[in-house]
Amino acid sequence: MSDSGSQLGSMGSLTMKSQLQITVISAKLKENKKNWFGPSPYVEVTVDGQSKKTEKCNNTNSPKWKQPLTVIVTPVSKLHFRVWSHQTLKSDVLLGTAALDIYETLKSNNMKLEEVVVTLQLGGDKEPTETIGDLSICLDGLQLESEVVTNGETTCSENGVSLCLPRLECNSAISAHCNLCLPGLSDSPISASRVAGFTGASQNDDGSRSKDETRVSTNGSDDPEDAGAGENRRVSGNNSPSLSNGGFKPSRPPRPSRPPPPTPRRPASVNGSPSATSESDGSSTGSLPPTNTNTNTSEGATSGLIIPLTISGGSGPRPLNPVTQAPLPPGWEQRVDQHGRVYYVDHVEKRTTWDRPEPLPPGWERRVDNMGRIYYVDHFTRTTTWQRPTLESVRNYEQWQLQRSQLQGAMQQFNQRFIYGNQDLFATSQSKEFDPLGPLPPGWEKRTDSNGRVYFVNHNTRITQWEDPRSQGQLNEKPLPEGWEMRFTVDGIPYFVDHNRRTTTYIDPRTGKSALDNGPQIAYVRDFKAKVQYFRFWCQQLAMPQHIKITVTRKTLFEDSFQQIMSFSPQDLRRRLWVIFPGEEGLDYGGVAREWFFLLSHEVLNPMYCLFEYAGKDNYCLQINPASYINPDHLKYFRFIGRFIAMALFHGKFIDTGFSLPFYKRILNKPVGLKDLESIDPEFYNSLIWVKENNIEECDLEMYFSVDKEILGEIKSHDLKPNGGNILVTEENKEEYIRMVAEWRLSRGVEEQTQAFFEGFNEILPQQYLQYFDAKELEVLLCGMQEIDLNDWQRHAIYRHYARTSKQIMWFWQFVKEIDNEKRMRLLQFVTGTCRLPVGGFADLMGSNGPQKFCIEKVGKENWLPRSHTCFNRLDLPPYKSYEQLKEKLLFAIEETEGFGQE
């Protein structure tokens, strides 16, 4: 017998709730000759009040599901499996049952469940001993800390009886008593008679067991029936917590509506052993005083509240050493109901709970407002909340805030390609000092692009133009005819749009002169909508019926998506997508899939994975990284990314990050050349232009048909043609040299990656279906438009139970106008699932049932937070009483909400 002074382990790991993924693989059932067609089985998994079901397999005795189910369990939970046969016209028939103890499975697998395959024998419904088949399952995602592995169990033996029990945690205010609600016993050896008191049976001196109930003598009782019946109370094996497979089987009944009041008790003594330690007030410690008990050595001494545990030794029974537990917060009290289950009473808020309350984290304070409502103040962040904070919730929030800041940093880096550097701002300030035309009008700014061309920004209307606003009107130009508009190309060349005939031309209708000699006609911009409609038509022709389910977790989004997308056939990926985030209540009618595309594109295109890189120092468009070969599976990932990008185009979803224009040209099977270098590497482009326009023989540059490239710090030489290192570049062959260098720069070291990308891309969407688009149109088709037109948003919004003149609607649009563009995108993402807009703007927003405009509906009370339905582009806006309240609630909703089913 080990010493009674051994340390008891903490119960925290055994009662901690964790997520467990159960994959129901298959089953083998005995054939029933009465049923010719065979059963249509499905599996129901229940644990701790949760129930999950698989899909049915029609008419088979060997069903195969391979369906993952996610449940919330504790290490001492018990899984119950029921195999049912689906019946069409009557109730389903139970074929067999099986049970699995999680704690025993953890012990046999080193306290870790990682893809553990278990085969269970199914017992009959009427005769449990009869085996009707086998059920194969796979458990994954649960791990117990090493502390529990080393101290989690103790095998004790007395008089021939062996026990294997998990450890027990005792209340700090009771040195020799433990609560009935605890999930097991201690690490220290416990006498067999003491355990017999738990199970309702005692053990005689000869080692035999006799069925005898434990008598408990009480001086007071919380139960009126016990108090009225007498002082003796019987606790049988059925009423006491049973020990099953070495652990306590917890039960969670409905919360008691009116718990019994506490009754003062006297200190207890067991066989002359020292009494319990001095009691503390229930409001401060939450522990209940023990009951005065008189027992025999063969009987378990207990009360309706607590059970004293003794350790048998050479000198007689000794009390167990208690495990120190944090005291209850002020105003809380610990009680035990008539079934021995511990619950906690909050005398301040007048409520009860099963969970032990924790003190407030450092820096938090509890306050009460004028209406008597309790709220909590965080003095670190100077924020308030109605939800009671815990150490775990604060830690999870800090971790989420860190991840969110990292995500925002990545998005900010992507948006920096639209921010001009300090040199441009310095040049602008210098030009203002010596500008002979004087200062610009209010709200205007003069800027210079990467090629040195000057343009002007009107911050009032958020537009840019090539002409100087100070010189407009000085030439006394005639106005354009009605229906005409003058625009400028990316090169600053003016052209004219005739909205009456829907045509464009370089010829000025006022003078009849052309801006270019024989300039080509530019396609009318609205033709792009016709292209999109034509493309969507062909996607519908290629689409497959029904849908496929994609189950991914937010923590392992990249790897889960990779495994599932690569496991499906290309035809299955053309079906309608049904994306599931385990543990969230969102039903995917389009909104969840939009968020999945948005989040996954941010992951797979992240340069940190070394699959893609930024096109240049000041260009945050993405291109394939030549050094991706350091990942041995990089070609598989590029094939996966090709499938993913094709799925985004095929299903009409947007991605978070865009590619470089030459990469879009490759997707369109269009040739790339020297001109494409300008957008990704202006310095390299300008150097080639200088070589083209100057005599290199006079400069004696000694260039050869060979180039150097640096990958991961290693410089390698590449010949543009066979034996190119010995072929000198001259005036006669420099055109060939420039062409080959440009092709090499645009495709250097990425041939295999590009081939793998298009292999996956063409499996979903053949490239010939995109031949009608150009590179910029493809970028808009894949990424959507980023700039939000407030007038277009307000013009195409609809309302339910509100009117355009309602004060809440007017406050909402005032709020949208006041916030910056980033928060507008967040608001748009909160309501629609993505911050990208379709090509046609808000007029072309799509929902689960087709076109669905942005909708604001009057729902809830003024103290509710706004809710959204991303599948229907609908915002549930409660009738707030003031603009400040509406602004506060909306900001909290769009900044702090993540996932679905979060109230």
From Swiss-Prot:
Annotated region (Disordered), positions in chain: 197-301
Pro residues bias spans: 251-265
Annotated compartments: Cell membrane; Cytoplasm; Nucleus; Early endosome membrane
Stretches assigned to the WW domain: 326-359, 358-391, 438-471, 478-511
Enzyme class: transferase
Pfam families membership: C2, HECT, WW
PANTHER family: E3 UBIQUITIN-PROTEIN LIGASE ITCHY HOMOLOG, HECT DOMAIN UBIQUITIN-PROTEIN LIGASE
Protein's name in the database: E3 ubiquitin-protein ligase Itchy homolog
Taxonomic source organism: Homo sapiens (Human)
